[in-house]
Amino acid sequence: MSGGFYNVECPDCENEQTVFGKASTEVACAVCGTTLARPTGGEADLLGEVIETVEAR
């Protein structure tokens, strides 16, 4: 995965949220607070299911 944006589904509440692929901070679900992405120094570790890649318009 490159450093694009991804729509990720929360494994707990099924909320769909857009996450940056190279997130430098932990990203939590806006609804329930479950961690969706963890920084790894490069590509973020996406913990939810990636629904789609968000393309530039």
Curated annotation (Swiss-Prot):
InterPro entries in the cross-refs: Ribosomal_eS27, Ribosomal_eS27_Zn-bd_dom_sf, Ribosomal_zn-bd
Gene Ontology biological process terms in this record: translation
GO CC entries: ribonucleoprotein complex; ribosome
Residues that bind Zn(2+): C10, C13, C29, C32
Keyword entries, A-Z: Metal-binding, Ribonucleoprotein, Ribosomal protein, Zinc, Zinc-finger
Cofactor note: Binds 1 zinc ion per subunit.
ZnF segments: C4-type: 10-32
Subunit structure, as described in the record: Part of the 30S ribosomal subunit.
Protein name: Small ribosomal subunit protein eS27
Organism taxonomic ancestry: Archaea, Methanobacteriati, Methanobacteriota, Stenosarchaea group, Halobacteria
